[in-house]
């Protein structure tokens, strides 16, 4: 099948999905599965393989995020119901003021994003975003948008995240220099993202009922309702902070051990297990069960109800995220990304813009930032021969920032951010998609300026 035909099929699929969700008000989970099925058949994937491809897409995403979203949601619900999120928000609001609090939380997200994967870190910070927004009496989008933006920037540009690490190997870039330059460029990108988010947030966006319940601006279900006694004596700032920092520190320890310890070290496997996001969040949840619930006089039944009340909202996020993975997998298997990349490679572009444009096109066409970065690295692996070490790093970063832009409905991260921030699909495209594209272009332009200097 020709490249043009594949691109038309992919474009028609995206348009159909937008019409189903925005105009026809079809549930995103159902719409994503339906469009994925139709695109798979139209793109020529054998009928007997379509089901396997869709299941692989669902499993590939849910295998990594289901447990994390579930545990993170329960931990966040316990912190929120105890009054801990508001306690933390009140403390920092008194110390910094509302405007500085947004900047401070964004800065914290930058450091959190270096060792922790984007989806894990954002899920951990979600209850804090709700708490700060509630205290400031503003939309959680004002906190969540710059926080998510800087975390995704670090995720695509800075080792030890998989995209930049794998691309460095393909493009012969030194990991040390990639880390240093990646962090250095991510800082001004984050600053631009912070102010871009402020401009985007000048408009008011409607929040979903689930997020309104989290903010206690809509009646919650009986199971998830907060008893007044739970918040009369909220936990202190130190306790709440520790419950957030502990899983992050454990994950960091696992990441550092994998980087510094030899593969044969007897403790490496144990440290990697403990440092996995799943185990780290389980440890934090057990601590919250003891410190926020049992020690504060909550009954076992009440504690169980609170933890259980987090799961319906988490289930929606999980299902829609998984369906987004299905759509992305179908687009990958259809060959649309590869065909597009090969077509762009035949156009005589300078090396740095080629790395960015190919990666951005792959990101927009099939959804996964990591796949976009890796594919670009593979396509350009021979083109970087003869470059000096810093130039190899800059080509790698150009590909990474291409993978940052254009996060939309075929990206599972789009659904995580929009669902947690209570955005509709249309508003998600106006906010999150616009912000990631601004961040991607900003990162590339700074990288190009550095290239010109050296």
UniProtKB/Swiss-Prot annotation:
Compartments in which it is found: Cell inner membrane
Any GO MF annotation of the entry: gluconate transmembrane transporter activity
Periplasmic domain ranges by topology: 1, 49-52, 130-137, 196-235, 295-305, 363-383
Disulphides: none
Cytoplasmic compartment spans: 23-27, 74-108, 159-174, 257-273, 327-341, 405-433
A Pfam family that the UniProt record links to this protein: GntP_permease
Gene Ontology annotations for the cellular component aspect, listed alphabetically: plasma membrane
Transmembrane segments: 2-22, 28-48, 53-73, 109-129, 138-158, 175-195, 236-256, 274-294, 306-326, 342-362, 384-404, 434-454
Membrane disposition: Multi-pass membrane protein
Keywords tagged on the record: Cell inner membrane, Cell membrane, Membrane, Transmembrane, Transmembrane helix, Transport
InterPro entries (UniProt xref): Glcn_transporter
Broad class of the protein's primary localization: membrane
PANTHER family in UniProt: GNT FAMILY GLUCONATE TRANSPORTER, INNER MEMBRANE PERMEASE YGBN
Family, as annotated: Belongs to the GntP permease family.
Annotated protein name in UniProt: Inner membrane permease YgbN
Organism classification: Bacteria, Pseudomonadati, Pseudomonadota, Gammaproteobacteria, Enterobacterales
């Amino acid at each position: 099948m020709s490249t043009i035909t594949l691109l038309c099929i992919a474009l028609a699929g995206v348009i159909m999905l937008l019409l189903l969700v925005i105009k026809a008000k079809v549930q995103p989970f159902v719409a994503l599965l339906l469009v994925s099925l139709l695109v798979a058949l139209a793109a020529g994937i054998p009928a007997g393989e379509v089901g396997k491809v869709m299941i692989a897409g669902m499993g590939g995403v849910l295998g990594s995020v289901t447990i994390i979203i579930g545990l993170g949601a329960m931990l966040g619900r316990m912190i929120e119901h105890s009054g801990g999120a508001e306690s933390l928000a009140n403390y920092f609001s008194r110390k910094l003021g509302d405007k500085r609090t947004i900047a401070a939380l964004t800065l914290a997200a930058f450091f959190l994003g270096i060792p922790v994967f984007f989806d894990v870190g954002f899920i951990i910070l979600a209850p804090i975003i709700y708490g700060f927004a509630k205290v400031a009496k503003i939309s959680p989008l004002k906190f969540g948008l710059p926080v998510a933006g800087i975390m995704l920037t670090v995720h695509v540009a800075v080792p030890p995240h998989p995209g930049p690490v794998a691309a460095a190997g393909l493009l012969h870039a030194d990991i040390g220099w990639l880390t240093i330059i990646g962090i250095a460029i991510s800082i001004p990108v984050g600053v631009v993202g912070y102010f871009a988010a402020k401009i985007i947030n000048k408009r008011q966006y409607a929040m979903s009922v689930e997020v309104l319940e989290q903010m206690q601006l809509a009646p919650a279900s009986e199971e998830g309702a907060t008893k007044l006694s739970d918040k009369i004596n909220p936990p202190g700032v130190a306790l709440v902070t520790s419950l957030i920092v502990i899983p992050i520190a454990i994950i960091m320890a696992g990441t550092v051990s994998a980087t510094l310890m030899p593969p044969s070290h007897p403790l490496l496997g144990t440290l990697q297990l403990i440092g996995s996001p799943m185990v780290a969040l389980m440890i934090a949840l057990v601590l919250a069960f003891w410190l926020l619930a049992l020690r504060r006089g909550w009954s076992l039944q009440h504690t169980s109800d609170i933890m259980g009340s987090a799961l319906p909202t988490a289930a929606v996020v999980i299902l829609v995220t998984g369906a987004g993975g299905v759509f992305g997998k179908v687009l990958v298997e259809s060959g649309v990304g590869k065909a597009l990349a090969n077509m762009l490679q035949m156009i005589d572009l300078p090396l740095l813009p080629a790395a960015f444009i190919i990666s951005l096109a792959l990101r927009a066409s099939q959804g996964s930032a990591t796949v976009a970065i890796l594919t670009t690295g593979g396509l350009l692996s021979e083109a970087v021969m003869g470059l000096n070490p810093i130039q190899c790093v800059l080509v790698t970063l150009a590909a990474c920032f291409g993978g940052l832009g254009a996060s939309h409905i075929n990206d599972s991260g789009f659904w995580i951010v929009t669902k947690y921030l209570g955005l509709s699909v249309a508003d998600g495209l106006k906010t999150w998609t616009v912000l990631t594209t601004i961040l991607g272009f900003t990162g590339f332009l700074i990288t190009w300026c550095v290239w010109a200097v050296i």
